[in-house]
Amino acid sequence: MGQKVHPNGIRLGIVKPWNSTWYANTKEFADNLDSDFKVRKYLTKELEKASVSRIVIERPAKSIRVTIHTARPGIVIGKKGEDVEKLRKVVADIAGVPAQINIAEVRKPELDAKLVADSITSQLERRVMFRRAMKRAVQNAMRLGAKGIKVEVSGRLGGAEIARTEWYREGRVPLHTLRADIDYNTSEAHTTYGVIGVKVWIFKGEILGGMAAVEQPEKPAAQPKKQQRKGRK
């Protein structure tokens, strides 16, 4: 059977940035890693209904900065910023250093693999037919400009006795092309028949120039100079 490498892991440092960007010496590394895990676990549980796509953690000069990428920033911030202040205090207690929380809005949740997977999961838990949920996700992504999308669900689909896997793809999803900007994520639907796994791959286009192109806008290409023909004497 064909085995596939994790699409995000193989592209780290090529076209994908890390979710934790900090440096620590040998003594502090394990503590930082543990607090990162606890912060992510707490925020994921606390913001379960806030459509959180990604949590980025930075550690500048004995402090911690957490950026929450969400499709519903209003739910995270709360009334007059009360909810985000509560989150900041808990994160500071977990990490043991002063904390800062930034909110980044996801403009197109239909093109975010994590949010698409979570959307399909919630539909499956509400007993929506899995084929309808998959097709709707694919159509929405392609309508908003995705170059390709693949959705896979596996488990006791429709309450069947034997578990199986079904997938639906539209466009192209080049997993072997390292410069391809492929967003991949998974989710689990807990139904009365058991757990149904959901995987989503979204191809947004190719990134030329590696990480430098991801962080900086592309410069216009220089036009070649026209050669002047010398007249005969």
From Swiss-Prot:
SMART domains, sorted: KH
Gene Ontology cellular-component terms for this entry are: cytosolic small ribosomal subunit
Q: Which PROSITE patterns match?
A: KH_TYPE_2 (PS50823), RIBOSOMAL_S3 (PS00548)
Q: Where is the KH type-2 domain?
A: 39-107
Looking up Pfam families in the UniProt record yields: KH_2, Ribosomal_S3_C
Reading the lineage from the top rank, the first entry is Bacteria
Q: Does Repressor show up as a keyword for this record?
A: no
A GO MF annotation of the entry reads:
structural constituent of ribosome
Q: Tell me, what is an example of a GO biological process annotation in this record?
A: translation
Q: How does it assemble?
A: Part of the 30S ribosomal subunit. Forms a tight complex with proteins S10 and S14.
Q: Which family does it belong to?
A: Belongs to the universal ribosomal protein uS3 family.
- Please give the name of this protein: Small ribosomal subunit protein uS3
Identify the species of origin: Pectobacterium carotovorum subsp. carotovorum (strain PC1)
What's the name of its gene? rpsC
